[in-house]
């Protein structure tokens, strides 16, 4: 009887681990988005976010998915897909969850068509330039961001785009996923056709 009870307890323990909604296969990582729901995020702005085929997608409007919790030192890993002309990004340490911008957060940019290395894909706006500038459009990508104290590193598809950049303006805050409107064309019309998708977002406290 004792042996059966011990086996039963072990099986129950394994079942609990298997069904944990926050569990990740790697030690220390917590899933914020797994393609199924947006329980860990609030939407602000007018971007038309919706769940499609295991991803959260937007192709119109200007807005953010803002994490419900704030974080200080961590690694974040996100899988994303964008059109070549899409304007997106991952904002970290956002101090105002109702109004996200580069003036109150660190903006890790995803924008292939911006020629300025301060704003290119993989750059941290006003903190870390990217050179040479990678291209993320038309494919799935993995972006890893490390924020520890005043030091920031960005890795895109295994290649460092920002290496140990320094800035101390913001110590903690929310995480925000962006769908932004593009630039105006010669007729003054804003490009609003870029598709942005996120299918997995994980975080690990440091």
PLM feature segments, named:
Residues 12-20:
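Hydrophobic h-region of N-terminal signal peptides that target proteins for export
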Residues 19-206:
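Carbohydrate-interacting regions of secretory-pathway proteins
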Residues 3-7, 19:
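N-terminal export leaders
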Residues 9-11, 188-189:
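Detector for intrinsically disordered, low-structure N-terminal pre-sequences
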